[in-house]
Amino acid sequence: ICELPARFTASATLTKIPGLLYSLGGRVDVGLDRGAAPTADAPVVLTIQPGVVIYASTGVSWLAVNRGNRISAIGTPTSPIVFTSRDNVLGLVTDDSQGQWGGVVLLARAPVTDCTVAPAATPGSVNCERQTEGAVDPAYFGGATPNDNSGTMKYVQIRYSG
């Protein structure tokens, strides 16, 4: 088992190694929040190889791809990337299992219309942002970039998240 760091500060690759599981020990950030406005800074990119399994043990564990950073999770039909719960890894889930961990959240700079951070902001503007719900330490999303790119996810399974 390899526990992921609380924050990836440089681009990294999670390699598929037979028998190795990656663990989210809480909130795991891909890069720092680079704000609502686009910047020229190089993004932190988390690359995940086909067949990698990442699990979380608690409801407060989640992967946050912060604004201005990216994920490249490209599995294959026969070797998908799996994000799941510890109970799933241990074979303890049932058809009713759900909400066992927080999930994968892409915090983009795309326009939002409900400005909760600055309620007086114009919807869809760079000043119109929101916060994630349900997190002890909320993350921000929103901006004015309709074509924002938080990366690519293909052949990815997200199991038992909340």
In which residue ranges do the predicted regions lie?
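Beta-strand/loop edge motif enriched in small/polar residues
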Residues: 1-162
